[in-house]
């Protein structure tokens, strides 16, 4: 089965160490709420603020999830320290998109996907199936790998922080973006399909992607 998606808008951010100059303070004026946000949450809030998503369904993907919170929990266990309730709460995969949905009062469907290197491809497939209902969806992938001693195990990812979002709908138009056998050096493989689409998105033409289900 093949489903064509039209990409209506795209936005992405990435950095080799840490994405800076975010508008978190303006987007999240409540200090108590803002202090609870993980870095992934801040990135997702940032990209979603670029879209009109009051009633949009969201498909979110991350291979590594909330790596810092998970690392903090494991370190506390190793050191026989008390676990942080905030780290425990923030360690689940849907943390970032859940905070964003609360902030933007989005009460619609949210699906979280984690599938290793194929995460962004699975997000596209899930989004394509959901788009058959006829409405617009937001597809997001993010990775925040900038944690202590990450250099000891990382030898292939240049950009430790990255986030990308697409606004899509189903389409009958001819595909114009080929996502087969793509290469995207320096990025986590888990976001490469959606990041490739975003980087090749143009507002001056139709942006149609064929998704094989």
Pin down the residues of each PLM region:
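Conserved "HGTGT" condensation-loop signature of ketosynthase/thiolase-family condensing enzymes
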Residues: 1-122, 129-213
């Amino acid at each position: 089965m093949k489903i064509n998606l039209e990409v209506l808008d795209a936005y992405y951010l990435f950095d080799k160490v840490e994405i800076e100059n975010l508008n978190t303070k303006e987007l999240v004026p409540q200090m108590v709420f803002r202090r609870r946000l993980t870095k992934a949450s801040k990135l997702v809030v940032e990209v979603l603020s670029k879209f009109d998503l009051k009633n949009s369904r969201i498909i979110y993907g991350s291979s590594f999830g909330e790596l810092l919170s998970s690392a903090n929990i494991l370190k506390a266990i190793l050191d026989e320290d008390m676990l942080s309730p905030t780290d425990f709460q923030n360690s689940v995969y849907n943390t970032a998109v859940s905070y964003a949905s609360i902030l933007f009062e989005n009460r619609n469907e949210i699906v979280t996907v984690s599938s290793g290197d194929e995460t962004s491809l699975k997000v596209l497939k899930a989004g394509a199936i959901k788009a058959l209902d006829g409405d617009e969806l937001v597809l997001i992938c993010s990775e925040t790998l900038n944690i202590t001693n990450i250099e000891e195990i990382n030898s292939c990812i240049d950009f430790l922080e990255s986030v990308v979002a697409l606004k899509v709908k189903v389409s009958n138009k001819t595909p114009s973006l080929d996502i087969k056998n793509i290469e995207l050096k320096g990025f986590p493989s888990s976001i490469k399909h959606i990041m490739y689409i975003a980087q090749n998105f143009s507002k001056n033409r139709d942006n149609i992607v064929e998704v094989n289900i």
